[in-house]
Amino acid sequence: MAEVVEVLVPGGKATAGPPLGPALGPLGINVKAVVDEINAKTASFNGMQVPVKVEVNDKKQFTVTVGIPPTTALIKKEANIEKGSAEPNAKVAGNLPFEAAVRIAKMKLEGMLSYELKTATKEVVGTCVSMGVNVDGKRPKEVLADIAAGKYDSVLLK
């Protein structure tokens, strides 16, 4: 029976230490080989926490599946900020271009509850509300109203 280990690792910087080492060590596989493959596959997500699934079969062979980082991590990267606002309704942490919100929605679409790009983008902008990040220089709730009114349909309904 295959063993499955799911962990969050820093993109391109996984190590044999926790959380990977202790989880993989008892399975009897080459932890360094797993770490090297994870780092190769997550290099493009440098600086973000990336969900990784390692499946190990009975013959000690492994496969590494890399997930997409959380929406908040993608927003922080696109907006060039360290963290969201401690007071999202009072202080603005940064600004996210609308095109970046659409890009994030396209990346995350498969794992979201939304079926359409328009609603997925609304989910991303909604996350900006709780992070205190403006979208296109406007408060995220204004952008949500604009999306609902169809002002961004030319971008979202391609």
UniProtKB/Swiss-Prot annotation:
InterPro entries: Ribosomal_uL11, Ribosomal_uL11_C, Ribosomal_uL11_C_sf, Ribosomal_uL11_CS, Ribosomal_uL11_N, Ribosomal_uL11_N_sf. The keyword Zinc does not apply. Keywords: Ribonucleoprotein, Ribosomal protein, RNA-binding, rRNA-binding. GO terms for biological process: translation. Gene3D superfamilies: Ribosomal protein L11, C-terminal domain, Ribosomal protein L11/L12, N-terminal domain. Pfam families: Ribosomal_L11, Ribosomal_L11_N. GO terms for cellular component: large ribosomal subunit. Disulfide bonds: none annotated. It comes from the Archaea. GO terms for molecular function: large ribosomal subunit rRNA binding; structural constituent of ribosome. The keyword rRNA processing does not apply. Belongs to the universal ribosomal protein uL11 family. Part of the ribosomal stalk of the 50S ribosomal subunit. Interacts with L10 and the large rRNA to form the base of the stalk. L10 forms an elongated spine to which L12 dimers bind in a sequential fashion forming a multimeric L10(L12)X complex. Forms part of the ribosomal stalk which helps the ribosome interact with GTP-bound translation factors. This is Large ribosomal subunit protein uL11. The gene is rpl11.
